[in-house]
């Protein structure tokens, strides 16, 4: 699963997920899966969507993952009283804003890519749409 090799700090503040995304254009592949809503993707969700796409296209073509879970999400253990500091980092999340292209695909027909992205979107907690590369 995806996570940073090293970070400057072990824990970060929760913060807010406001604003619009960077990386809103399909730049590497021919087709893309773009977020319409906002939310948090865990490393497990990103990997589950990648597996669903890879299995559907039967390992032909190429897939790019454009989101990186770089924010630790912390939890306290079960049956532990409140207080005594912040919990330990359990998993990693990527914050998603509207307009972010999360996955890209190349080397497959459009119908196959559309169906693969539909299967991947079922694994993700944000609403998505299918986009193609803009030719100028």
UniProtKB/Swiss-Prot annotation:
One of its GO terms (cellular component) is cytosolic large ribosomal subunit. Coiled coil: none annotated. Pfam families: Ribosomal_L16 (PF00252). GO terms for biological process: translation. It comes from the Bacteria. Keywords: Ribonucleoprotein, Ribosomal protein, RNA-binding, rRNA-binding, tRNA-binding. InterPro entries: Ribosomal_uL16 (IPR047873), Ribosomal_uL16_bact-type (IPR000114), Ribosomal_uL16_dom (IPR016180), Ribosomal_uL16_sf (IPR036920). GO terms for molecular function: rRNA binding; structural constituent of ribosome; tRNA binding. Binds 23S rRNA and is also seen to make contacts with the A and possibly P site tRNAs. Belongs to the universal ribosomal protein uL16 family. Part of the 50S ribosomal subunit. This is Large ribosomal subunit protein uL16.
């Amino acid at each position: 699963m995806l996570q940073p090799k090293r970070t400057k700090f072990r824990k970060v503040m929760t913060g807010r997920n406001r604003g619009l995304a960077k990386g809103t254009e399909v730049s590497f592949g021919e087709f893309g899966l773009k977020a319409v809503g906002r939310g948090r993707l865990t490393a497990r969700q990103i990997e589950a969507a990648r597996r669903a796409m890879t299995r559907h296209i039967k390992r032909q073509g190429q897939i790019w993952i454009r989101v990186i879970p770089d924010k630790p999400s912390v939890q306290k253990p079960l049956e532990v009283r409140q207080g005594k500091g912040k919990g330990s980092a359990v998993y990693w999340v990527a914050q998603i804003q509207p307009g972010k292209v999360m996955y890209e695909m190349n080397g497959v027909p459009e119908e196959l890519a559309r169906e693969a992205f539909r299967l991947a979107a079922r694994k993700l907690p944000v609403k998505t749409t299918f986009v193609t590369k803009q030719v100028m």
